[in-house]
């Protein structure tokens, strides 16, 4: 972790990398402000403000969409477009980060050099990552149904279900925690393998993740806590700040620009952390 801290401090001298990540993060925050926050607010409204009902209604909505071939085709088209955008953006940004952490000399048009070398591979990997992420999230939502149903019954007055509720909730939380942790770690370490090896990217990334698994779990857990707390604050502000009037400027400033600054720093730290761990693994296996 000390090596990661040193790399983050050194990055302050590379304004080009910070600007590249800031540009990408601004696009993400714009989508988050105009699409993700309204959707989250809408989902909670569907369930009448009840969190458990919102989960069940969301699952029903998703399964309804998946039963329509037209929506599946729309979804695949959207995933393809998103993968191509990620292929362009990530191939350039990650190439710059990988070169920086590998202490390689900075070259002109480094971003576009990364796009030229890795666009196709990163696009294909991004398509798979996005598609697998959607399917995995749907599967995990379905996994929660028994626990949600039993918990609703318990909260509805069936106190005899206390032991069963605690058991199902604990098992479900453990499955969700380790399921998402394994999935995200393996997906994240797929990317640095592309920039450091010639083939077998997923296998190498998985091997790297397995080598430092518990160290990575602790690292990701810290990121999760920071990210979730910050998102909860933003979601709360989104629900209470007016969209018009004198305080509308404060809403835009907090939900867009403060969010943008914090997320830029967050994504840079996460990327450096993942690539630093992977490069430590590379040194270990290539000695």
What do the PLM-derived regions correspond to, one by one?
Residues 71, 75, 107-137, 161-176:
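Alpha-helical membrane-spanning segments of integral membrane proteins, especially the hydrophobic core
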Residues 49-52, 281-287:
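Short, highly charged, low-complexity non-transmembrane loops/tails of multi-pass membrane proteins
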Residues 3, 7-10, 54, 58-61, ...:
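Low-complexity, intrinsically disordered, cysteine-poor segments enriched in small/polar
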Residues 1-41, 105-112, 173-247, 251, ...:
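Nonpolar helix-loop interface/hinge motif
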Residues 35-50, 138-155, 232-243:
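Membrane-helix interface motif
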Residues 17-98:
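Short, small/hydrophobic-residue-rich motifs at membrane-helix boundaries and re-entrant hairpins
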Residues 27, 77, 81-85, 120, ...:
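Hydrophobic alpha-helical transmembrane segments of multipass integral membrane proteins
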Residues 70-102, 140-148, 159-199, 249-283:
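Selective recognition of hydrophobic, aromatic-rich stretches within alpha-helical transmembrane segments
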